[in-house]
Amino acid sequence: MDKAFLLHNPRCSKSRQALEILKNKNEDFIVFLYLEEKLEASFLKKILSKLSIEPRQLLRKGEAVYKENNLNDENLSDKKIVELMTRFPKLIERPIFIKNKKAVIGRPPEKVLEII
């Protein structure tokens, strides 16, 4: 994962703002449309490691799929949560900017500046 990536949802205003910030800084990165392209569990685990957070911390709790899959169940394993995030990428908080050994969740969007 040497190339910089932005996990991007074009329908999300925060994600669009983060994209603009990175473009204005002339950053070289790949836009990964994670809702359209398959997100592998191994890639998601690397992102979690770079963020230094547990899978549960990356969940969007307001999504219908969160409630439908009982993700508020504290007994769900990290492995199961990662599996559900790959199956239902809408569950993943966004945007996420990944560069070198670091990653940040772009909330607020200016947080992407922390790792450039």
Give the role of each language-model region.
Residues 22, 115-116:
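Alpha-helix C-terminal capping segments
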Residues 26:
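Short glycine-rich hinge loops at helix-strand junctions in the catalytic core
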Residues 36-115:
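Thiol/selenol-based redox catalytic cores and closely related redox-interacting motifs
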Residues 1-21, 29-32:
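Local sequence-structure signature of Cys/Sec-based thiol-disulfide redox active-site neighborhoods
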